[in-house]
Structure formats: structure tokens, C-alpha cells
């Protein structure tokens, strides 16, 4: 939250804090545990993007009067000139592409989002952030799931849902 506030201040745009803790727990964490309990591999990032970021967040932003929301996903949204449909496309930096975690987004959602980082490499993004003196320019990147400490799924499940851990054959 503090990084977002610093960036918003640097860009001179309003910053709002909305608590999605319960929604995240109910829609993402419970799903994650439930899928593991069923022996399936969950994709909590897809779930979070669909229900929290591009669901509740979009709804709240529109209610605050925003026309669109920009995120830091490395993907692109383009509107087809002939059909008017919005197309979700891979980010130009294929090493950082995140279009795969956005595949569930509908036309109604896509029309309200901008993904400006999808047109740049990670290196170029950092360079631009540095030139703009953004406080996150050199922040280490993360590849793991945001709520799993040290990317240790087993320890997380053992702590949060020990009843689902059963030895295999």
C-alpha cells in the first residue's frame, strides 16, 4: 500500500485504499486450499485477477468516477477496428508476459482496463520508472504467489489446512 501511495503521489493522481481482505480470503485463499484438497493444481492468480482486481476493484473504481483502471500486468489490450471487440494479447516482453493469468476477463472488463507495461520490457520499465523518480524503480521482482511465504506451498498448507495433507502411495 505504501509503494502504491508513493507512486500515486509521484504521478500526482489520487490514491484510495480499499480493504479486500475478506474477499481475497473467501475467493482466492479458500479456493487455493480447496483445489489442493481435491488433488488439483490451483491458479490463484487467475482467480484473484478475475474476482478481486478485475471484479471488485473495477466496480469500486467505476463507482469513484474512474473511466478505466491501469495495472502493471505485462500484457496488452487492443480493440479490433473491424469488430470493436477487445483483444487480450501477450506482452511484448515474452519473458514477462502475463496474458495467461488474464484469460478469463470478459469484454465488459477489458474495455475498462489499460495495461501500459505490456508495451515495454522489464528493463525499459525500470529505466522509465527511474527517470520519473518512482520509488519502486529498483524494487526486487517477485515470481511467487503473493500470499505464500518463501514460495513454500507445503508449509503454507500445513499451517492453514493440515487436515488436507495426506501421504501418497
What are these regions (language model features)?
Residues 1-103, 114, 124, 130:
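ATP-dependent adenylation/nucleotidyltransferase module used to activate substrates
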Residues 104-168:
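Internal nucleotide-binding/catalytic subdomain
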Amino acid at each position: 500500500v505504501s509503494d502504491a501511495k508513493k507512486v500515486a503521489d509521484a504521478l500526482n493522481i489520487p490514491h484510495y485504499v480499499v480493504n479486500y481482505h475478506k474477499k481475497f480470503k473467501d475467493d482466492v485463499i479458500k479456493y487455493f486450499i480447496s483445489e489442493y484438497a481435491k488433488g488439483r493444481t490451483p491458479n490463484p492468480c487467475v482467480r484473484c485477477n478475475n474476482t478481486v482486481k478485475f471484479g471488485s476493484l473495477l466496480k469500486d473504481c467505476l463507482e469513484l468516477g474512474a473511466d478505466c483502471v491501469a495495472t502493471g500486468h505485462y500484457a496488452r489490450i487492443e480493440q479490433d477496428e473491424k469488430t470493436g471487440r477487445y483483444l487480450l494479447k501477450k506482452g511484448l516482453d515474452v519473458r514477462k508476459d502475463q496474458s495467461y493469468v488474464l484469460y478469463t476477463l470478459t469484454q465488459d472488463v477489458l474495455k475498462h482496463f489499460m495495461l501500459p507495461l505490456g508495451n515495454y520490457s522489464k528493463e525499459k520499465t525500470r529505466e522509465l520508472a527511474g527517470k520519473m523518480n518512482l520509488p519502486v524503480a529498483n524494487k526486487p521482482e517477485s515470481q511467487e504467489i503473493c500470499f505464500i511465504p518463501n514460495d513454500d506451498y507445503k508449509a503454507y498448507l500445513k499451517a492453514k489446512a493440515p487436515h488436507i495433507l495426506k501421504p501418497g502411495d
